[in-house]
Swiss-Prot record:
Keywords: Aminoacyl-tRNA synthetase, ATP-binding, Cytoplasm, Ligase, Metal-binding, Nucleotide-binding, Protein biosynthesis, RNA-binding, tRNA-binding, Zinc. This is Methionine--tRNA ligase. Its cofactor is Zn(2+). A motif ('KMSKS' region) lies at residues 336-340. It is found in: Cytoplasm. Homodimer. Its EC number is 6.1.1.10. ATP binds at residue 339.
Length: 686
């Protein structure tokens, strides 16, 4: 762990440009990295916060084929969507680059060539899966099969998303091509491998011995499991038609494996930024006084803690990450987030339904971040976080301070009189919070840090509630000047301390308090007058509006519709029954009828007792449809009735027929009935 670094290089996992960004990405990677970077800048630190679009690999080619466009068109489309989402949610990258950029192609090629020239790769001809029908080798997501470790039948050729294991395509049991559905054959091909086994001792000493106390247990444990299991050579090239060409002779048709080229994207993004800003990029990657931190999700731990460090060690001139604070996964309403199944809250769609409420989502995701275990996002919790915390605690305090200052002093910060013991204690407690919040942030405990920020707002609310300036203004207006001065110091401190977490709120507070000077993090502790007497503040505005039940129900309904659609898509039709003769069918007397009465069967949850006009009579039919319909809503409904079914007693009532039904995707029943009006009761169906 580096003590007192001169600069910080912060990286956030490169998002893959085959789809938009959802709340899982934001909670797992981009919120914590943004909070950390913003906090460091408020400390006056030299920060390079780097990210960019990951634009190579099999998933891009697959998306292009699915959408009927070129890979370049795919990455251009989603790079634009992703960039906008990051801007919309205030993710403060110093540079957001692209791995399709020339500077990245050059950087990745040079990196590979240096290791190649040093003899760090193993060149080997191996047997790989090959789709003869598509005339293509099957790497990564071009092949699915059964995971040899957990039995998941939908594991990919590079990773099992169920158990998180990193795989080779040849590890899969019963592999199938995702291009044609064919069973692949084995075919020889030449590739280059990074011999990870050579770096086992280095990784053991560096991580298992050197970072046991400061790396998160979930990260340390996964890395230890990998090392203890024995590291093996890892391919760094692929047989693909999209990506960075392998820059050596005899490598025609080969591309750099996306997980070799992608982390180098952090370096090329830094080069691009440094050239633009007139800085020396090497200081941020090759200087021992620089602290390098990778923010990722748990599915990327092996790449950032084993493969990329081995690459950096092999190259020889780069620093190693000081920490890799990977998060676990965020689930949605009890189910795993899934882009393919549209089980997600997409950032661009969120803003359509909750305009200008970016900080509410930032808050809810940070408060419930999956820092040490998988966590669940629910819309009810989102609503409660806004209404009961942001609005009721934070927003309420700011509103009272601004309203009372404008009411009593026409918006001018009053000159305080002598501080009471309560005032002194409150201001002393306030000055302690920056260090408390810093301690949490610097240990990557962002949930804990956010909780301490809210305690500052609670401190302000308690101070006002105990002091009651709205009552005292009638009896001791001079005392109220001091009370409001203290409250305004807390409000200004909140403006500074909330910026890493709630940047849009911080900007609103700038306008409300008319703060022009750039206050630093440590000013809250060292500066006794964060906002000066005589300073005129602005008018108040509602920071956090109440989120109503109807808004939340709309989101829940949207997810239910998605769930229903997924059930329908995945549901397989029942196999055809045995053949019957026409005479068997002709025996059934099917007629149109109308339900004229309906009531629930006593002591039965599923049964309704119906009176049905069949055109030939009015008869009683007991039907198991009570879980799909209420009696009131089906009176007058036309239905299809099997009228010559032998009567059958159900709970003591004789049922004299059967009504034809079918199933909807959500499991409810639906009537099979005429699709036009005017069909009379008793009309036959044949």
């Amino acid at each position: 762990m580096i003590q007192n670094p001169k600069r910080y290089t912060i990286t956030a996992a490169l998002p893959y440009t085959n789809g938009p960004i959802h709340i899982g990405h934001l909670a797992g990677v981009y919120m914590p990295s943004d909070i950390y970077s913003r906090y460091l800048r408020l400390q006056g630190k030299d920060v390079a916060f780097m990210c960019g679009s990951d634009e190579h690999g099999v998933a891009i080619s697959m998306k292009a084929k699915k959408e009927g466009i070129t890979p370049q068109e795919v990455i251009d489309k989603y790079d634009g969507i992703i960039r906008k989402s990051f801007v919309d949610f205030g993710i403060s990258f110093d540079n957001y680059s692209r791995t399709s950029a020339k500077i990245h192609h050059d950087t990745a090629s040079e990196f590979f060539k240096k290791l190649y020239d040093k003899g760090d790769f193993i060149e080997e001809v191996t047997e790989q899966l090959y789709d003869a029908k598509a005339d293509q080798f099957l790497a990564d997501r071009f092949v699915v099969g059964t995971c040899p470790k957990c039995g998941n039948e939908e594991a990919y050729g590079d990773q099992c998303e169920k158990c998180g294991s990193t795989l080779n395509a040849t590890d899969l049991i019963n592999p199938k091509s995702t291009i044609t559905g064919e069973t692949p054959i084995m075919k020889s091909t030449k590739h280059w491998f990074l011999p990870l086994d050579r770096y086992s001792d280095f990784l053991t000493k560096w991580i298992l011995e050197g970072h046991k106390s400061d790396w998160k247990p979930n990260v340390y444990g996964q890395v230890k499991s990998w090392i203890d299991g024995g590291l093996e050579p890892r391919a760094v090239t692929r047989d693909l038609d999209w990506g960075i060409d392998v820059p050596v002779a005899g490598a025609e048709g080969k591309k750099l494996y996306v997980w070799f080229d992608a982390p180098i994207g952090y370096i090329s993004a830094t080069k691009e930024w440094a050239a633009r800003e007139g800085k020396d990029w090497e200081l941020y990657w090759k200087n021992e006084d620089t602290k390098l931190v990778h923010f990722i999700g748990k599915d990327n731990i092996v790449f950032h803690c084993i493969i990329f460090p081995a690459m950096l060690k092999a190259e020889g001139s780069y620093i190693l990450p000081d920490n890799v604070p990977a998060n676990e996964f965020l689930n949605l309403e009890g189910n795993k987030l899934s882009t393919s199944k549209n089980w997600a809250v997409w950032l661009h769609e969120y803003l359509e339904d909750f305009p200008n409420q970016q900080d509410v989502l930032r808050y809810a995701l940070t408060a419930n971040a999956p820092e040490s275990k998988d966590n669940d996002f629910t819309w009810k919790d989102f609503q409660a976080r806004n209404n009961n915390e942001l609005a009721a605690i934070f927003g309420n305090f700011i509103n009272r301070v601004v309203v009372l200052t404008n009411k009593y002093y026409e918006g001018v910060v009053p000159t305080p009189n002598k501080f009471s013991e309560v005032d002194e204690a409150t201001l002393t407690e306030l000055k302690a919070y920056p260090a408390v919040i810093s301690s949490s942030i610097e240990r990557y405990r962002f949930r804990e840090a956010l909780g301490e920020l809210m305690n500052v707002a609670r401190l302000g609310n308690k101070y006002l509630a105990d002091e009651e300036p709205w009552k005292m203004v009638k009896t001791d207006p001079e005392r109220v000047k001091t009370q409001m001065y203290v409250a305004l110091q807390i409000a200004t401190a909140l403006r500074v301390l909330c910026e890493p977490f709630l940047p849009f709120t911080a900007e609103k507070l700038n306008k409300m308090l008319k703060i022009d000077a750039k206050l630093s993090w440590n000013d809250v502790t060292t500066n006794s007058d964060l906002i000066l007497a005589g300073h005129k503040i602005g008018e108040g505005e509602i920071l956090f509006a109440q989120i109503e039940d109807e808004q939340i129900q709309k989101q829940i309904d949207k997810l239910e519709a998605t769930k229903t659609a997924n059930i329908a898509e995945n549901k397989k039709a029942e196999p055809q029954k045995e053949l019957i003769q026409y005479d068997d069918f002709a025996k059934m007397d099917l007629r149109v009828g109308t339900i004229i009465e309906a009531e629930k069967m006593p002591k039965a949850n599923k049964l309704l007792v119906l009176k049905v006009d069949t055109g030939i009579d009015v008869r009683t039919i007991v039907s198991g449809i009570a879980e799909s319909f209420s009696p009131e809503e089906i009176i007058g409904k036309q239905v299809t009735v099997l009228v010559n079914l032998a009567p059958r007693a159900l709970r003591g009532i004789e049922s004299q027929g059967m009504i034809l039904m079918t199933n909807l995707p959500d499991g409810k029943l639906a009537f099979v009935n005429p699709d036009v009006a005017g069909v009379g009761n008793g009309e036959g169906i044949n």
